[in-house]
């Protein structure tokens, strides 16, 4: 009888401890959450102390992807699934290696202190696809600020936007060329400087100020010789890609990188390397990125993703996230388009 009581007491103690650890609340930017992630047996990724964010409100500035209602997505543009395309999907695929002549694919940009991820993810993938689908004839970088400021149906500029309408705008209105503020080439360069996003590096800290959305200029910088209207690059079609791993892979293999959004949780703010999956913390908002490929490491399938927080962040500007189970809704809202 005593043995039974002791066993039950031990079990209760174990369960209480287990529940306590599972439900423990960590400060998002603390040493405690970093230790918890790095010591977690099933994490699969490494966390590192960050000096980028001063608060969660500061972090939320970067989360500029707004969800498009499913009914509106279906109404505004078609959804492709590629079920009619029978092809062997490789275990690893990297658009940078598949199309090495398209320089934009390997370019990591910086959205700075503006919730313009939705615009960056879009113009980055559009630039890639323009080059790929033109056979290298349109090897350009398209302007994030042209889309950010002139697409009224996309959202609120630096305060966030919707992915789908950005691609529709590319088809209807076109987007001009650009580069970073530092390089200052093309028709309409990005006006905000590169800065360090929760890491230490060669750029100045991003600071606590969110930039106001610039006005829509519809003119090129003075030294650029091509008129604004003649510098426009347009797509022929925009469409949703079905929430399906193989459909997304086929789309990337055939036409190039895609734009997607995912839910950012508190633990992601501390990401340094590895294959991310949500371990702890609450949702902060949506973030738009560019999926350029996939792979498998230690039997874990992943998406290879280009971020817009410059090359000092994460894995040289990239990160990986678990593939095939809609981790953090990464496969739920994938957008793409074609130029021909």
From Swiss-Prot:
Entry's Gene Ontology molecular function annotations: cysteine-type endopeptidase activity
CDD domains, per the entry: Peptidase_C1A_CathepsinB
Signal peptide start and end residues: 1-17
Top-rank EC class of the record's enzyme: hydrolase
Active-site residues, Swiss-Prot/TrEMBL: 117, 287, 307
Keyword Protease found: yes
Tissue and organ expression note: Intestine (gut).
EC number(s) per entry: 3.4.22.-
S-S pairs: 102-131, 114-158, 150-216, 151-154, 187-220, 195-206
Function: Thiol protease. Has a role as a digestive enzyme.
Family: Belongs to the peptidase C1 family.
Name of this chain's protein: Cathepsin B-like cysteine proteinase
Lineage, highest ranks first: Eukaryota, Metazoa, Spiralia, Lophotrochozoa, Platyhelminthes
